[in-house]
Amino acid sequence: SLAVACVLALGNISDRMEKGLSQQSREFMAGDRSLQSSRAVPKAWIDEARQRGLKVGEQLTFATMTFARDTPQLANVKAVDDVYPMYGTLQTNPPGLKPQPGSVLLAPRLMALLNLKIGDSIDVGDATLRIAGEVVQEPDSGFNPFQIAPRLMMNMADVEKTAAVQPGSRVTWRYKFGGTPQQLEAYEKWLLPQLKPEQRWYGLEQDEGALGKSLERSQQFLL
């Protein structure tokens, strides 16, 4: 009947929309799930995830002073590994760049504040790194009204050279996980009993930011 056909059609549309939202949520997070911690998690946790077939990426964010020809400027540093971004696109100028060892990507505002151009060098802590380009948009940047300092992106391999991260430093580790729903669910059951109170395992649905709340409302509408 017409009523049955309409219900089936609406169901198909709802399924397609939900799949589209799921794909977008992956890109907004640059992963299917995130693990956030104020310190590096045990290597065994990452090894276990990879043994279960999950793809894992690591990020570290912290604030530190940068210098260009003795001019200081606080920067919000995001160090990433070669997996980044697991999903989504890092928009840069010139296009197609990723943070490579020995080089950095700067937000246009940081470039302007320090009067720098692509190809110049910048001191990040004890390390002198070459500016390969500008960060235009990060897939997982979200919206953080408290992030006052402009972004500087670097490769995880260069963090130790900066000496900016010491015991007691305020840092945030984020581990991004990608895999099938079954792989993620099995790993979650293994991981959750081991988490400390300051550690958080979440998908975009559990994210407290605006994107997470928007996705939750969209899913409720589809249901």
Annotate the PLM regions.
Residues 1-223:
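Membrane transport/envelope proteins' first extracytoplasmic loop
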